[in-house]
C-alpha cells in the first residue's frame, strides 16, 4: 500500500496503479507467449548475488477455465553466486544444476525454461542447457520481469485463468449472512486476488 499511496500522492488515480510481484509478472510474461511455450510446466531460474530461485508453473484445467499454480524453491544452498567466480566452481554449479534437472524431469513434463538474473550472464551451465534443450525450449533474458509487468495490464484478457502464487489468496474467503430469512454467501476475497490490491 505504500507504493500505491505514493503514486496517489503524485496524482495518479488509484485504479491506474497496479503493484505486481516478480512471480505475478513472470506468469504474465509466460501467458503472453504462444501456448506451445506453456503447453506443459514452465520453469524459471533466477539468480542474483544473494539467491538462486527456481519457480515452476503448473496448470490444471477446471470447468470454468484454467488454474495456474506457481511453486517456488530456493536453491541458494546448492548453488551460490560466489561459486561462479572460479572455473572449478562454475563446473561444480553446472553439475549440481544438471543433477537437479534430471531429478526434476522424472516428475515434471516441462515445455520451456527461462533463465534470468546476473548469475546467468555467463554461460556456465552448458551441460544443464544441453539437457534442457533436448526436448524443451530455453530462453535467457534480463528484462523478463519488466516485460511481464508491461503485459500484466492485459490480465483482463486472461479472466478465465486463476493464478495462485505467493502474494495471492489461495481460497475464496467469505462469510455467510442472513438476508430476508435466507443464508447468502458474502464474498470478501476471491481466490487469486492479490493481497496488495485487497
Predicted regions and their residues:
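Short glycine-rich, Thr/Ser-proximal phosphate-binding strand/loop in the N-terminal lobe
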Residues: 56-91
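Conserved beta-strand -> loop -> alpha-helix junction used to position metal-binding or nucleic-acid-contacting
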Residues: 12-27, 69-77, 137-151
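Nucleotide/phosphate-binding catalytic cleft detector across ATP-hydrolyzing
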Residues: 1-47, 57, 95, 133-134, ...
Amino acid at each position: 500500500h505504500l507504493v500505491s499511496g505514493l503514486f496517489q500522492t503524485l496524482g495518479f488515480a488509484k485504479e491506474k496503479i497496479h503493484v505486481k510481484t516478480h512471480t505475478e509478472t513472470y506468469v504474465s510474461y509466460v501467458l503472453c507467449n504462444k501456448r506451445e511455450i506453456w503447453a506443459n510446466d514452465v520453469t524459471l531460474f533466477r539468480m542474483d548475488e544473494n539467491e538462486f530461485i527456481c519457480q515452476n508453473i503448473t496448470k490444471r484445467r477446471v470447468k470454468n477455465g484454467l488454474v495456474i499454480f506457481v511453486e517456488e524453491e530456493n536453491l541458494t544452498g546448492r548453488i551460490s553466486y560466489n561459486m561462479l567466480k572460479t572455473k572449478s566452481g562454475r563446473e561444480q554449479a553446472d553439475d549440481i544444476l544438471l543433477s537437479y534437472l534430471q531429478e526434476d524431469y522424472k516428475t515434471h513434463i516441462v515445455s520451456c525454461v527461462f533463465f534470468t538474473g546476473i548469475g546467468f550472464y555467463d554461460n556456465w551451465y552448458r551441460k544443464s542447457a544441453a539437457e534442457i534443450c533436448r526436448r524443451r525450449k530455453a530462453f535467457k533474458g534480463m528484462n523478463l520481469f519488466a516485460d511481464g509487468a508491461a503485459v500484466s495490464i492485459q490480465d483482463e484478457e486472461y479472466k478465465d485463468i486463476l493464478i495462485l502464487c505467493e502474494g495471492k489468496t489461495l481460497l475464496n474467503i467469505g462469510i455467510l449472512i442472513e438476508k430476508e430469512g435466507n443464508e447468502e454467501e458474502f464474498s470478501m476475497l476471491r481466490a487469486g486476488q492479490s493481497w496488495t490490491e485487497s
